[in-house]
Amino acid sequence: GGDYGKTKRIMSIDRIKDCIDFWYKYLNKDAKDIYVIFFGGEPLLNKKGIKFAVKYVRELLSKHNIRPHFSITSNATLLDEDFAEFLVENKIPVTISIDGGRHIQNKNRPLAGGSKSFDIVNKNVKNLMKIRQNLTARVTLVHEDVGHLVDIVKDLWEMGFGQVQYDLVSTDDPKLKITE
């Protein structure tokens, strides 16, 4: 993952609490269900923060009999067994950002240092699949890979993903942008 030229920072527990308190202040307390999604950047850079947020949101919403529903989108590079168990125990659906099999994944989604990501992602996904059967893959489709969409879906199904979703890349980069 890239940093888009910005300083990388992890949100503190105090900051997370402040954000949740602000959100809660304006929340419709008559709601029956509330959905919280952890995504963007790489949420698993702050596992401690996610665990805190899930617990704290549940505490706040329980005062009003509101059912919280959580989900997370991750590139799975930091998905360890402990956090996988947390996700399963808390019934948090997981979407994995992965662009295809080995070749396409390594080309499109290198690690921050430039090394290949597929083997790490594949291992972590397999570990999660041992305790949670149904995972969704989310593909970001770039110009060069449009003609390989069927192969991408087949590769991901063979990896064990139950669902495959795709989005077209949003960029002005002519090498990536889908123009046809």
Where are the language model's segments positioned?
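Radical SAM/AdoMet-radical enzyme domain recognition
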Residues: 13-37, 46-171
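Short acidic donor-binding/metal-coordinating loop in glycosyltransferase active sites
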Residues: 40-41
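A C-terminal junction/extension of Radical SAM enzymes
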Residues: 175-180
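Canonical Radical SAM [4Fe-4S] cluster-binding loop centered on the CxxxCxxC motif
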Residues: 1-14
